[in-house]
Amino acid sequence: MGKVKRNAPCPCGSGKKYKKCCGSKVVDFPAELAAKEAKQIQEDLVEYAFTVHRESISGFINQHDFLSAMDRQTKDISVFNLGIWGIFFHPLAGEKTIFEEYLQKKGDSITRPKTREIVESWQSMTPALLLLKDLKEGIIHFEDVITAKQFEVEMDASNQDLPPVGSLILGYPIHEAEKAEFFMQFTIFPVKRTEALISKVKKYADAAVKDGKTPEDFMKQEFNNVLFALLAEKDEEPQAEKAEVSTVEWANDLEKETAAAIEEGMSGEEYPTELIPAVIDIWKTFCEKKSPVIRKPEAFAAAVEYYVNAISLNGASVSQAKLAKKYGVSASTISSRYKEIESTLQDEADRFAQALSS
């Protein structure tokens, strides 16, 4: 850490002069400050990658043909994961990775030793597919599906909806100060797909191990195959509920995209599979009566899910804030779209409520 002048404000954030605070004693700066700085550096690193090396990282991402067949939400998830993979594991900055170049150019500006220690530890980061084994008092116990290693993450249940036991989590585990975390964000897969998805990924992993790779090398070197298995590869058995969107005639692609977003968003454990056709019928009826102007399909998808919960005779309540986080839109936008749907479908509300409850 650079030398702090005695009369300068103390870097610990106390508001006191350095000579009257940490300068008068040997002290470790709060781990929380280091973790906060590390999170900011995560964002700065990604921004650096997509500005300074925009062409190389975009070319790296777009070489994966499976992206073209994905819906918008799935593609966004894939692009994020491929981007982080490219930043850390591919020499997209000459002979260096983008992360290595970033650390070389900006490392000296990271003055807090603990923060620098956290950031440098990202060099040993490995992508992971984790099975949620247990959840107690905000501590989540994971098992790495590929390496069988155990992993614990502390999550605040008051600030986010915690995934259910049995879920699969895809992400980049790291350590921030005294606790484990994920690099920026992670992806949750529904419990009902866990067994099938693990089977798909292990086919690729087993083949790599037979070729002499370690499980860790497989995740670092063939992460694109993991993404393909999880997000792009078709299930061996056709899912009947998926046919609903494709068999309906839509006025335009945005209406169809919204229907797909509704189906995707409501295919988790909260709702029975047989509910989906009735929900798609609600969206279809609204489109026929209103011909909505759709700027972001996820906004209407969230509003439809909220509407379903509002009118269903046996639906579980769900907040607009929770749906905003789920669909990546604002709560105020959901509120506006919900009012639009509610007013348009006043005459059909009782019929839809009965259909949803039967």
UniProtKB/Swiss-Prot annotation:
Positions that bind ATP: 207-214
Keywords annotated in UniProt: ATP-binding, Nucleotide-binding
GO molecular function, one term: DNA binding
InterPro entries assigned to the protein according to its UniProt record, in alphabetical order: Cyclin-like_sf, HTH_Psq, SEC_C_motif
Protein name per UniProt: Uncharacterized protein YccF
Organism annotation: Bacillus subtilis (strain 168)
